[in-house]
């Protein structure tokens, strides 16, 4: 990890994304056993990898396309960061295929961690470009111009369908805020955000955006209507093949 003064002296978003210690918040609340075999998918040599290695974990880094070619390997934890390219299939079907492959690579009590954007996240309504297409409103419109090589986000319902169909019986959903890329808070179904808490919404480090409406006020309304999970900008899933409780994984 680069010192903060060096990060802010650079103009590259890629450097900021890879080395900002804010990103450690995504997995920092979880407990990993030393010597755990961890497969990191779509994550280069970043601060997240460094954090896990400092805990004594054995980390292997691959792309999603390489991950589905792995054979005769077993991992204690698999971490997928970001969305998947969906090709000719429906997006949720492609996700199911990848998740099924990940399940094959996990040890019997292994855990899959998936950090992804919500295609119906409030930030996309409010004027942020789609993270994968670089266009405004494309995820909200169902990706009408997407190519087979581009990546697609799903909704909460379809992510959980894909995970369930892949054979994961225990699926816990967390809500990184503002999103999984630079999370300042991690919420859960047992601890959802309260009115007024979601007030750090101008976080478009990678691209320009519009400000179509006051996101804090919109989030307040969504929270009051008890529909925040459907409009969270990102999701963080912790999944196991059986019904084992996830509480032991969480430090705080």
State the predicted function of each range:
Residues 16-37:
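Conserved alpha-helix/loop element of class I SAM-dependent methyltransferases that forms part
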Residues 76-93:
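A short SAM/SAH-binding and catalytic strip from SAM-dependent methyltransferases
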Residues 113-137:
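Conserved class I S-adenosyl-L-methionine
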Residues 177, 183-252:
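C-terminal lobe and adjacent flexible extensions of AdoMet/dcAdoMet transferase-like proteins
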Residues 68-78:
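A short acidic, Gly/Pro-enriched loop at the edge of an enzyme's catalytic core
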Residues 92-111:
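A short glycine-rich, Lys/Arg-flanked "PGG" loop and its adjoining helix->strand segment in the class I
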Residues 45-57:
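Conserved SAM-binding loop of SAM-dependent methyltransferases across substrates and taxa
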